[in-house]
Amino acid sequence: MSDDKGTYDPKEGCSDWFVLEAECSDASLDGDLEKLFEEGTDTDISDLIDNEDTVQGNSRELLCQQESEESEQQIHWLKRKYISSQEVLQLSPRLQCISISPQHKSKRRLFEQDSGLELSFNEAQDFTQQTLEVPATDVVPQGAKGLGIVKDLLKCNNVKAMLLAKFKEAFGVGFMELTRQYKSSKTCCRDWVLTVYAVQDELLESSKQLLIQHCAYIWLHQIPPMCLYLLCFNVGKSRETVLRLLTNLLQVSEIQIIAEPPKLRSTLSALFWYKGSMNPNVYAHGEYPEWIMTQTMINHQTAEATQFDLSTMVQYAYDNELSEEAEIAWHYAKLADTDANARAFLQHNSQARLVKDCAIMVRHYRRGEMKEMSMSSWIHKKLLVVEGEGHWSDIVKFVRYQDINFIQFLDSFKSFLHNTPKKSCMLIYGPPDTGKSMFTMSLIKVLKGKVLSFANYKSTFWLQPVADTKIALIDDVTYVCWDYIDQYLRNALDGGVVCLDMKHRAPCQIRFPPLMLTSNIDIMKEERYKYLRSRVQAFAFPHKFPFDSDNNPQFKLTDQSWKSFFERLWRQLELSDQEDEGDDGYSQRTFQCTTRESNGHL
């Protein structure tokens, strides 16, 4: 066989089939060409080209359908965190058990649940890596959003710690650095600081207007998901009341709110609220609270620099007739909002000593004033403070009701008020329920006298109150008390000077003031008290005190009745005219124990 035409020298690396070459037959090729030309250009295939008019069809509907599917797919990816798949939920426990790399506990990430902001950011970054297509399910209703937030909070072991951490992350300052803690939810306070978690913007805006009727000052700043309130209410409210109000206005649960009163004496806290109100993102309504202005305004800081003046405090206690330490401390502390000296008193470290010194000085001034005044001046001064109208006839009718000659009683009462020797002690005796104590107590009350109790007779100081009064009373004198009076108080009833033992002081020389006694014993018939008969003026009350059908006393022994009695019988009692003693139409200058101010009136 002859060699075929073509390349026979194969290159290294080629397979053997490249050696073979096709063989051509000239005879067969010539026959095929002749046959081809004889048949011509006719073909057996019919209707290969369609020359009819085209129809539009539903291409537009198809385009709209494709765009709608694409839009739904985009929305689906945006809302994928709200969509749950039953299949994924069933597979999730198994998938969680499968782990390629070892798991490490994160110490910095304290909370798994979040408001949605950070999780959404992380999901947006991992969007390209997501390969699992979650089938679409029903979207959670909007009304169930708040319930889901509460459920997320309930999953936390410490809800308050979570809210405090989110607050500090949002505002850059700790919530407890701005507030002081109230352990009881029933303690009332005017000012409250509140932080609320995950509030809808519409409800937050509406609360600005709804809180105006409740608050004098509103401070609101929102940094999602937290918002911060400073509410200064018109009246004091407890934490329970504040939470009830905010839950109704903001449609949130109490677990989403932390409420505490602000720090009133912290300069840093006051500056936080003051500087924050200048932020355009902060809503502020009303005037600044006093505790903010005090620590931020220059004029208030200058006022606080004022030193405490004890004489001003003594003058206040004297003018308001406060002599007890507790009353002085309580009433003067309440003036701190308006009085600079009272504010300086609260800032002083020795408040107890100042109150004690003030009470001592007031008693000294009162005692000196009383010693200088006569009985007429004393009665006139005490009657000036009695308000209202009464009738002197109630006193007269009651004395006559007890079968007492009123002229004789008036004469003895005149000697009693003038502290006449051997006539300065008046005894009212009789059976029980005759009005003895009611009659004498009403007189002691209107003249601001002192009541002595024989129950303290074992103490050597039980008679000390007589040194600070113009009239005294010993109620319900028994045989034991009569024996004591007969043994130790004869000189006192004579009207002479006696030595009275005073607590924490040296014994003083005084004369006993007019002394009234009530008793169920008639000493005029007791032989063993014969030495007291000449020293005591006795009047019997034999009849029981009458009451009407409504159980009201028929004789009104009130301050107004005694005021009318003294004014009506002033001359008969031989009380001196106040014009003779210098009281001409209240023109006398009142007592002043403070130094006159440089800008004071002349």
UniProtKB/Swiss-Prot annotation:
PROSITE patterns: SF3_HELICASE_1 (PS51206). This is Replication protein E1. Keywords: ATP-binding, DNA replication, DNA-binding, Early protein, Helicase, Host nucleus, Hydrolase, Isomerase, Nucleotide-binding, Phosphoprotein. It comes from Human papillomavirus 15. A motif (Nuclear localization signal) lies at residues 79-81. The modification Phosphoserine is found at S85, S92. Can form hexamers. Interacts with E2 protein; this interaction increases E1 DNA binding specificity. Interacts with host DNA polymerase subunit POLA2. Interacts with host single stranded DNA-binding protein RPA1. Interacts with host TOP1; this interaction stimulates the enzymatic activity of TOP1. It holds the Pfam family PPV_E1_N. GO terms for molecular function: ATP binding; ATP hydrolysis activity; DNA binding; DNA helicase activity. ATP-dependent DNA 3'-5' helicase required for initiation of viral DNA replication. It forms a complex with the viral E2 protein. The E1-E2 complex binds to the replication origin which contains binding sites for both proteins. During the initial step, a dimer of E1 interacts with a dimer of protein E2 leading to a complex that binds the viral origin of replication with high specificity. Then, a second dimer of E1 displaces the E2 dimer in an ATP-dependent manner to form the E1 tetramer. The gene is E1. Belongs to the papillomaviridae E1 protein family. Phosphorylated. GO terms for biological process: DNA replication. It comes from the Viruses. The lineage of its organism: Viruses, Monodnaviria, Shotokuvirae, Cossaviricota, Papovaviricetes.
